[in-house]
Amino acid sequence: MAVIVWWLLTVVVVAFHSASAAVVESTWEVEYKYWWPDCKEGIVMAINGQFPGPTIDAVAGDTVIIHVVNKLSTEGVVIHWHGIRQKGTPWADGAAGVTQCPINPGETFTYKFIVDKAGTHFYHGHYGMQRSSGLYGMLIVRSPKERLIYDGEFNLLLSDWWHQSIHAQELALSSRPMRWIGEPQSLLINGRGQFNCSQAAYFNKGGEKDVCTFKENDQCAPQTLRVEPNRVYRLRIASTTALASLNLAVQGHQLVVVEADGNYVAPFTVNDIDVYSGETYSVLLKTNALPSKKYWISVGVRGREPKTPQALTVINYVDATESRPSHPPPVTPIWNDTDRSKSFSKKIFAAKGYPKPPEKSHDQLILLNTQNLYEDYTKWSINNVSLSVPVTPYLGSIRYGLKSAYDLKSPAKKLIMDNYDIMKPPPNPNTTKGSGIYNFAFGIVVDVILQNANVLKGVISEIHPWHIHGHDFWVLGYGEGKFKPGIDEKTFNLKNPPLRNTVVLYPFGWTAIRFVTDNPGVWFFHCHIEPHLHMGMGVVFVEGVDRIGKMEIPDEALGCGLTRKWLMNRGRP
């Protein structure tokens, strides 16, 4: 099994920062590679021949410079730095069609930005469904004065994996009628899973030991994390899944949740943790179990009927005498027990000393999430508009006043839902497509109510983890059924709501968030499930338009569509 030694990682980090001072710089070549993520050969999108991509390790205040070389033969690429607010550098956010053009094959684009706040983050492709192809890695920003006390740490990057290519998946989702891509074949921890092995890569369903086909040095073999007894370890967890909602447990150990999406939270103890796509956590694990044993870290599916085996990693005490854990891994909680999931979400509060939200908001959006049809194509819509991101990036269109590049009519801020039954399929299944924006003045307080509803057929409402670019927001609360304006606001938590950049919208319910428009730019706000975003489930926020018009934006970020023509006519190359 692959072994990670925490103290070695720490030495590397210290040496890196000693040599690099306040600049973390690297050149990344993105290309397809043959790989065995789940013991079955497939094609991954690798960085410098590595899958998952290299970990960025920086200190708050550092400048990160990444030169991305596109070595893909026939497609563009961008990279989004998930959780980094990009204050003053919206062009470096890495959202194709929103903040930049795709990097063409053979070309290089340089991302340069400051990591202004410590936390556990990650990066991933944000063009088409490239995240699902393995274009992702961890991004750790350390605090010069860490408030947590622990002896070592490990990164756990969680993902899901299909044997079908992303191009086939995109075609299936865009077909008429839509062809659903199905559940992932495997779950991965740090790029490793076991598709052709029995449960736990060691046990069959009856609990009897079984033999797997992989060897100890295979790319799919479970990693081993070596620990010493009676120590405290920080597990940095990030979910970059394309579809799956997950649950993580460590056999024989409890977890203390201390960080969520790069923000400290009031510590609380759990036996396992739900992790939705786009979320990150830090948990503290005390190694107080029998040191002669080995223990499983297991990751299973939540929120969808599980048809995918667990992903596994091994906790190995240095004095352990076992060759492998002698017991089956923890059983993932029942997939459709949403009350259990909601109970976990409602335990998350801001740590002491964190800023409280403003008492009142200046504006409110109520975003109704529905599944609809557009000319018989299945789409996801927000307030009856399925987002169609234009070829010309919004940031360039707004910076240079190119008003023909996107729809000037903004989507509805609220739909009249008095007679809309969220518990049933939509009475009118048809929707529209659009590229309009929500335009906010600089420095105002905005509330967003995410409202879930039934899908096109049956009695089903899906989980949607929503992620915002360029911001953190306060999670004010969750509710059942249809949001009641003027009434449900009274239930908002204004005392100690957590700051997040990703929040879950539960089936047949609503979620309320609040943020301040203090970061001039164009920011994506979307469901973090790849198929849902591909099918139109997102909106675009623009704030501080007058300030965007004064920004110095690199021409290379905007060299496509109408901005390309505008820049050429200005006499620039």
UniProtKB/Swiss-Prot annotation:
* Principal location: secreted
Q: What induces it?
A: Repressed progressively during incompatible Turnip mosaic virus (TuMV) infection (strain UK1). When the plant is infected by a compatible TuMV strain (UK1 m2), the down-regulation is transient and last two days.
Report the residue ranges that make up the Plastocyanin-like domain in this protein: 30-145, 154-318, 423-545
Q: Which Gene3D superfamilies match?
A: Cupredoxins - blue copper proteins (2.60.40.420)
* Glycan-linked positions: N196, N336, N384, N430
A single Gene Ontology CC annotation of this entry is: extracellular region
Signal peptide: which range, if any?
Answer: 1-21
> Which annotated residues bind Cu cation 3?
H126, H469, H526
Xref: InterPro entries: Cu-oxidase-like_N, Cu-oxidase_2nd, Cu-oxidase_C, Cu-oxidase_fam, Cu_oxidase_CS, Cu_oxidase_Cu_BS, Cupredoxin, CuRO_3_AAO
The coenzyme or cofactor needed here is: Cu cation
Q: Quick one: which residues bind Cu cation 4?
A: H464, C527, H532, M537
An example of a Gene Ontology BP annotation on this entry?
Answer: negative regulation of response to salt stress
Where is the protein situated, by its record's location annotation? Secreted
Give me the residues that bind Cu cation 2, please.
Answer: H82, H124, H528
**Entry note: cofactor:** Binds 4 Cu cations per monomer.
Q: Any idea of its EC number? A: 1.10.3.3
Q: Which domain of life is it from?
A: Eukaryota
The protein's role, per its UniProt record: Ascorbate oxidase involved in a redox system involving ascorbic acid (AsA). The oxidation of AsA represses responses to high salinity and oxidative stress conditions such as vegetative growth and seed production reductions. Negative regulator of defense responses toward incompatible Turnip mosaic virus (TuMV strain UK1) by preventing jasmonic acid (JA)- dependent accumulation of ascorbic acid (AsA, AS) and dehydroascobic acid (DHA).
| Protein family membership | Belongs to the multicopper oxidase family.
Listed name of the protein: L-ascorbate oxidase
High-level lineage: Eukaryota, Viridiplantae, Streptophyta, Embryophyta, Tracheophyta
